[in-house]
Amino acid sequence: MTIKSSYGDTYRSSVYNSWKKDGTARQGYYGDGDCTGCWFFGTAFSELKGKTITKVEITITRNSGGSSSAVGLVVKSHGHSGRPSGAPSYRTTAGTLSLATGETDTLPITNSTILSEISSGKVKGFGIQSTYDSSHYAVCSGSVTVKITYTE
């Protein structure tokens, strides 16, 4: 099963304490606050409730912004179907995907906690959150694809 994000957004704490609403997901810090990125999928993950999830693969594209060299995107699961009113909260770290600007790559997720939390309905999306500094700053496309392998 393949799911595409409905949209991506960035919550900026420490300066604006609000969502950027420009269609990108960002991490790190680059003058406009501590950036935490999210991809939202609406209720798409609810179709997987009760299934045995064996593998998840998320494909991410890094846009221009910040250093052009590779930055480690720290991918985490979250339980929000859409943009919350305040800062997002994350559940479990899925892994790190290193991308330079203009690159697209796929992170395989086999963390048993995340797989079981997708099945139980607790995980509804993914995001990126790393150290809040310029060396970890990255801007990603709001459009990501999640491929999920499961059995009934």
Language-model region placement:
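Hydrophobic alpha-helical elements and their junctions with loops/disorder across both membrane
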Residues: 63, 84-86
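Hydrophobic beta-strand residues in large extracellular and virion-surface proteins
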Residues: 3, 53-60, 71-75, 107, ...
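Flexible, small-residue-rich N-terminal segments that precede or flank a structured functional core
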Residues: 1-45, 79, 119, 129-133, ...
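Cysteine-clustered segments with highest specificity for TGF-beta superfamily mature ligands
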Residues: 86-152
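A short beta-strand element within beta-rich, extracytoplasmic domains
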Residues: 43-46, 50-65
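Short, surface-exposed beta-strand/strand-loop-strand elements in extracellular ectodomains
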Residues: 68-83
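Extracytoplasmic/secreted envelope proteins and their assembly/folding machinery
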Residues: 38, 50-53, 57, 111, ...
